């Protein structure tokens, strides 16, 4: 059997990674969240790093992202229907909020998973 090679020295730092919050696995609140929805959330969190750089901050100082359905499908290597299902699941868990405006790209607010206070925010 052939094996992959080892990492040597600084090679161990050469890749970037998606981070999935540990809380998604060790907190009962998230036990019913599907693994693919957890993965999608990690993609959305990663995209948050662009928010400040691209001035994706609303008038209430809340960061948001723009991430097209097509791009998510491509990045996750899954179908459009699958992404729609995972996005809906994240919405149902309160982990994202979507704002759609006619003729504009959807805005996605990635909610802070570590804060359990479920407040009904108006994002209009």
How should each PLM-predicted stretch be described?
Residues 2-4, 114-124:
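Charged low-complexity intrinsically disordered patches
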Residues 1-70:
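Short recognition helix of helix-turn-helix/winged-helix DNA-binding domains
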Residues 47-111:
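Winged helix-turn-helix DNA-binding recognition segment
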